[in-house]
Amino acid sequence: MAGAAGPGSGPGAAGGDGDDSLYPIAVLIDELRNEDVQLRLNSIKKLSTIALALGVERTRTELLPFLTDTIYDEDEVLLALAEQLGNFTGLVGGPDFAHCLLPPLESLATVEETVVRDKAVESLRQISQEHTPVALEAHFVPLVKRLASGDWFTSRTSACGLFSVCYPRASNAVKAEIRQHFRSLCSDDTPMVRRAAASKLGEFAKVLELDSVKTEIVPLFTNLASDEQDSVRLLAVEACVSIAQLLSQEDLEALVMPTLRQAAEDKSWRVRYMVADKFSELQKAVGPKIALSDLIPAFQSLLRDCEAEVRAAAAHKVRELCENLPAEGRETVIMNQILPYIKELVSDTNQHVKSALASVIMGLSTVLGKENTIEHLLPLFLAQLKDECPEVRLNIISNLDCVNEVIGIRQLSQSLLPAIVELAEDAKWRVRLAIIEYMPLLAGQLGVEFFDEKLNSLCMAWLVDHVYAIREAATNNLMKLVQKFGTEWAQNTIVPKVLVMANDPNYLHRMTTLFCINALSEACGKEITTKQMLPIVLKMAGDQVANVRFNVAKSLQKIGPILDTNALQGEVKPVLQKLGQDEDMDVKYFAQEAISVLALA
């Protein structure tokens, strides 16, 4: 590159011409060749600044050829370059000159690193829209053809992503050539190329004329769906969604459904997984009639698949499948053709399958209505609530509101609540712990009145559990409940019960009072803390057990910042000073620490 700011010039070259404005640009251009990768990367990221300074003509004639010739760099630098060039049209003189950006991007689309190629293709797709139809045929289509017939598989995979953007604006003769190139890539010897073609088959189908979809795309789909590589076959399933949307019911039944049915029974679980994963989209694409006759049987076999991953993917789609069924006859189809399979999955041996089902099964209550929910779904919910897998239980509890809307709180409390209470009092402390963690969620769904009536006593009972982890979790639970239900509720319902525990004969329970005060003080605010909690804490400073006394010091340190100066100086300070002289070393230490932290010395 010639001139003051040429890449070969040092920074001094620009300065020597007396043009100081180009000095930093010369530095940036020099850095494009620097041995330090980070400097090259920084310079590439400022490429638009360099281009602006050079002007459109020099960018076209000097910068772009330089970049094209030097594309032998670290992947990170090439990735940044591919991204920058996608937004460069304005810097080379606008759409009339967009074709100047094609050579460097063509080189980038052939490199070994996938992320660089993908970014180059993304930028090429962007730039294709800025070409006029004439320029597209003169410059862009030849580039696509070169990539499509390149010796290296890398260029051929990149070509697959470019057919759909140039096809709609091409002339009929060129369209035929583009289709021919795409066909040959679909039967390429290299699996990576066939994969790339299969992944773009649906996108390409959308821009083709209907006749071409039927005569060319469908045969390609059929071949790719029976490819020897399962990674190609599963991408063909994805393409099926787009293809199905384009065809009439008659053509679908004759041309596509046999292949799709075959995919649902493919010998590779990955292909069957893809059918399950795309099931809702396929159901919408083929329409209600074919869905009932062809897809429901396929779905049943996926729900009973020998691979857990496939069953889990199908289970995830149960709710959507049921919601997408035509309203007329929906209930009968679900009750006779889906529910028996769901019942089996509730006791599946794999926890991922059960968890997937639990995340959607509650939603069926809105589809099936009150009576069916009570008779058929509630027993399943109960079974899942008692499942040994915590995730299954959580997914049921998290979605209780769906059922609440359909059957009402009273019915819910009569059926599911006893199970929740049973778990809350389970002999295994880890089960109790799991229920505590769900409690704020449950409380939010059931509302304050219901909570006070049915669950409040449980929450208080956990505070005196014989396992410390339960007492600790119960304390945090109270704080979350106060955040949900507000300070007035705390003042009337929770705080009095917590403070009564300060007189408990068991010192562990007395300490729990302090832990609760630590957790609740912030949520309850200054007034409740000062008037109701502080007097109890101060009184406990005279406890006979040293562990209680040093926790008093820790509590005063915790709630101190919430209190006003009068309370701190008049009430807290004397008590901490007294504890600071305690005969127990730990009490003395924590009292002195509190005095220091609260600046009461």
Swiss-Prot record:
Q: What are the ranges of the HEAT repeats?
A: 20-58, 59-96, 97-135, 136-173, 174-212, 213-251, 252-290, 291-333, 334-372, 373-411, 412-450, 451-489, 490-528, 529-567, 568-601
Q: Does the keyword Repeat apply?
A: yes
Residues modified as N-acetylalanine are: 2
Record-linked SUPFAM superfamilies? ARM repeat
Q: Which InterPro entries match?
A: ARM-like, ARM-type_fold, HEAT, HEAT_type_2, PP2A/SF3B1-like_HEAT, PP2A_Regulatory_Subunit_A
Q: Name one Pfam family in it.
A: HEAT_2
Q: Name one GO cellular component term.
A: synapse
Task: Give the record's keywords alphabetically.
Answer: Acetylation, Repeat
Q: Does the keyword Acetylation apply?
A: yes
Q: What is known of its domains?
A: Each HEAT repeat appears to consist of two alpha helices joined by a hydrophilic region, the intrarepeat loop. The repeat units may be arranged laterally to form a rod-like structure.
What does the function comment of this entry state? The PR65 subunit of protein phosphatase 2A serves as a scaffolding molecule to coordinate the assembly of the catalytic subunit and a variable regulatory B subunit.
Q: How does it assemble?
A: PP2A consists of a common heterodimeric core enzyme, composed of a 36 kDa catalytic subunit (subunit C) and a 65 kDa constant regulatory subunit (PR65 or subunit A), that associates with a variety of regulatory subunits. Proteins that associate with the core dimer include three families of regulatory subunits B (the R2/B/PR55/B55, R3/B''/PR72/PR130/PR59 and R5/B'/B56 families), the 48 kDa variable regulatory subunit, viral proteins, and cell signaling molecules. Interacts with IPO9. Interacts with SGO1. Interacts with RAF1.
The family note in this entry says: Belongs to the phosphatase 2A regulatory subunit A family.
Q: What is this protein called?
A: Serine/threonine-protein phosphatase 2A 65 kDa regulatory subunit A beta isoform
Tell me which species this is from: Mus musculus
Lineage of the organism: Eukaryota, Metazoa, Chordata, Craniata, Vertebrata
Q: Gene name on record? A: Ppp2r1b
